[in-house]
């Protein structure tokens, strides 16, 4: 995605995990991308953006072929906890999205509560957003499962 952006674009990586921040920066360096990458917490950010990607923490049920233990460790209590966090992140991502901007919501989950149900509830409660399209990939031996939805802010 970053490779398709305007070369003068500023990328802003928001993640509490220093390990994931480092991983993101390493990926940009591997691809010889010359973007300025900043890390911050959502509450520290002023302004809004044309494109926001919310790749949220999830149950990891989409990686069950690679890590079968992800299914064994998963519980209804975990689902309730993780969906609460996902809603908070989606709310922050919405706040950071410009009018006429795009918001991409993604997980590596196959759980409807984390995916299409989350997005449908969000759009129902945020009349200024429209669901343009979504895709749910189920896990196979060739690839992990994943979900992504494209929302537009009116």
Label each region the model flagged.
Residues 1-154:
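S-adenosylmethionine
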